[in-house]
Amino acid sequence: MVGQQKLFQIGDFNFKLYHILVIGLLILAFSTTFLIRSQPAQYGFELMEFDPFFNFRATEYIVENGLSEYFEWNDDKSWYPHGRNVSSNSQVMLHITAAISYEIFGGNSSLYDFTILFPAVIGSLTVIVIFALVRVLGGTTAGIIASLLFAVALPVLIRGSIGWFKSEPLGLFYGLLGLYLFLSGIRTKDKKFTILKIVSGGIILSFGMASWGGNQFFILPVGLFILVLPLVRKDHKFLAWSIPLFVTIFLLSSASFERPGPQIIFGLSGIALLVPTVFLFVNIFIQKISKEKNKIKNGKIFLIIVVIIGIFMLLMMSSYFSETTSFRYLNAINPLLTTLDPLTDSVSEHQTTSTSESFIFNSILMIFAGLGVWIIFTKNVFQSKIILRNDMRVFALIIGISGVYVSSAFLRLELFTSISLVILSAIGLSILTKEIFKIKVSKKKNYSLKISYVLLISILFIIPLVYPENNWISTLDYAPTVFSGGTSYVLSTNDWLVTLDWIKNNTPEDSIIGSWWDYGYWIQTLADRTTLIDNATLNGNMIEKFAAMFLSTPDDAF
């Protein structure tokens, strides 16, 4: 084949023509997603939304004062008069990574401008990580397709545009990279590389946890994957040391951060990994003492028993988990809890995803993912021509199903649906494409079939990018939030920037400002003034008092 033509050699590696094609397509995916993510910059080079302003201020503190001071920092501009212990309740690795990146790559740019650009760059680099991850699951073609689909996946774009200096872009980068290293590690035959990848995967996945709490989602598919590993792989001696190594490194590394902290080990996340690891050993032992013909059967019976007991124990220990686990994460497991916490329910990004929103967000990915699920389940159809490892096949199904499930709780988590559908779609399309191009009929029909297939897939891929009017690309054509005052109106003014600048230059430096919590971070960062409440929502009682005050008459309010 032309693609296998050798171009040059670097050490023992033969650089072939198809490597150029892969690199070119990855550059295309990176460039495409970066341009789409950069659309808000045409209205003004500002941070998006609200939380990024606090994250900028925290990163600035590290750059100006160092890491040791950061971990001792009690932010006295927040939640007056108590302040806020920043390292204990914020995304530490986001601040550290951005600060280190600025020192290395910042050059002569201001830190503010650097943090505006940071999420778009990190989000765009994630197309390479998703390529590597899906390549491990389904091959190079699947990886390329995944990178192209991920580049335009709407929920991922929305929460990773230029100026979106929040936790999701970096959290996804670390989370998917850690997942890739883990899966690649348990596939690698060289023991030295296996240990290196597994240890690195555990540490980097913990970085993801310290960057974004939503990365706890990745624990669910990993835990379920560990449960079924002894049933789909026969190298039990390898599993007996590699899996505990990964779980131990991940939990210890995560526990070393103040958030999530040591409580992760015996919280819901830790148990979701520790119990499957114990099960792994027991299942291996059961299979070892079973007769050859009954090994898998007995292992499956034990798995069913453990799942039933696990569900029962979850119900029995619900009060324990409610004390050790954030309500938002419990809500992701049980979407029916949404309305029990009014403060959580009042936040727009915590609203339940509607059916219409799901179709807008994922549209064609649903069809491609359905194809992927069908192909994975009907493995015998393609078994003779395409090899898809059983363990990787199972993981693709697990992450696909679990991603769709947890996203049903919050609109914010819809990006996990996109990631799941991208993985399933890429695997399905890659296998189907290979099968189509292997069909040999008459020369004329052969060309017609292949051209028709390419046109059909291309049209289906392009439709959500251009139709309807509010499509996957145009959805990001909006001004940074500070230009619209946080409203949903399509406008761009400097009113808020002028107001905050006026506060900064015309009020005493020791002023204490009371506003609705949405605007706390803006006032602290752009006006350089202390606030009573802010977007961290650390004290629900204070927020309730402000709500009552704003909804009361002037006499009652005071």
Residue ranges and their predicted role:
Residues 2-8, 13, 27, 45-47, ...:
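Extracytoplasmic
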Residues 397, 402, 406-441:
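Hydrophobic/aromatic-rich transmembrane helices and adjacent perimembrane loops
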Residues 80, 84-96, 105-128, 161-165, ...:
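Loop-to-helix entry region of an early transmembrane alpha helix in multi-pass inner-membrane enzymes
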Residues 268-284, 300-381, 392-393:
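Alpha-helical transmembrane segments at the extracellular/periplasmic loop-to-helix junctions
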Residues 1-39, 50, 144, 280-310, ...:
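Start-transfer (signal-anchor) and selected internal transmembrane alpha helices
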Residues 13-52, 57-58, 64-70, 74, ...:
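Transmembrane signal-anchor helices characteristic of membrane glycosylation enzymes that use polyprenol
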Residues 192, 235-241, 292-303, 367-398:
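Membrane-interface helix-loop-helix junctions at transmembrane boundaries of multi-pass membrane enzymes
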Residues 29-33, 70-77, 118-136, 141-189, ...:
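Membrane-embedded helix bundles of polyisoprenyl
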